[in-house]
């Protein structure tokens, strides 16, 4: 899936004193996960999936201590083919099928933070690591994120690169199907652009 505020946005190590331990809930109405997938020849598709739920925790110094979120895989949409509704519907149907995300069997994907590494040069920037679960398989991913936290609210942004083949999603992969011509090869990696918002 071309993979997501998807959750990195909730992890911030901000050296602010005066906060009590606090857990904030993701606001699905203010959070988005965008996806982008590409082919070897350069073409690309993009769209969104909805955030279903999630939370993030900060300690009394304002430092992120944990977080997680759930994505509704049945909500996948496409944006770049709006001018071709028949093709758009076909693409979304294919992405939802067993060739890709098999959303009937696996209606959600999720991420759980396992580590936050602060950026010493910027209090709002960090590297987040955690367990990403998709299609019934879990792999660790890490990515840079920018997060702000103040007065019971948090916002975060990140771009996460996912190697779909590590989750068993091998359709169209040139690394697994050597007979594919270049115009049929789909990149193993896709991107999720996360823009997440949380509040009490």
Residue ranges and their predicted role:
Residues 20-200:
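Low-complexity, acidic/polar, glycine-enriched regions of mature
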Residues 15-17:
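N-terminal signal peptide c-region/cleavage motif recognized by signal peptidases
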